[in-house]
UniProtKB/Swiss-Prot annotation:
The keyword Cell division does not apply. It comes from Lactiplantibacillus plantarum (strain ATCC BAA-793 / NCIMB 8826 / WCFS1) (Lactobacillus plantarum). The keyword Membrane applies. Transmembrane segments: none annotated. Residues 68-90 are annotated as: Disordered. It is found in: Cell membrane. This is Putative membrane protein insertion efficiency factor. InterPro entries: Membr_insert_effic_factor_YidD (IPR002696). It is a peripheral membrane protein. Could be involved in insertion of integral membrane proteins into the membrane.
Length: 90
């Protein structure tokens, strides 16, 4: 199941995402975040984390650097909450 999900996300990245300008508010992108979460936590938890991340990616949120946390969580990685994608404090 894990491989099938990861292949589906990679297909999306090559077929659709590659032809549109990058507009994700977060780094890494939501699709890359989901790939890493699935790889690290398995299919079910990884998909849940990916869906939670996509739901956070909306106009009322600043975005920034938000890597997959070391432990399963549906919230933004608190270690990087006030930092931008270069790791500098805002």
């Amino acid at each position: 199941m894990r491989r099938l999900l990861m292949k589906g996300i990679r297909f999306y990245q090559r077929a659709f995402s590659a032809f549109s300008p990058a507009h994700c508010r977060y780094y890494p992108t939501c699709s890359n975040y989901t790939l890493e979460a699935i790889n690290r936590f398995g299919a079910v938890k990884g998909v849940l984390m990916g869906v939670a991340r996509i739901l956070r990616c909306q106009p009322l949120v600043k975005g920034g650097f938000d890597p997959v946390p070391a432990h399963f969580s549906l919230r933004r990685n608190p270690q990087y909450k006030e930092e931008d994608h270069r790791g500098k404090k805002r």
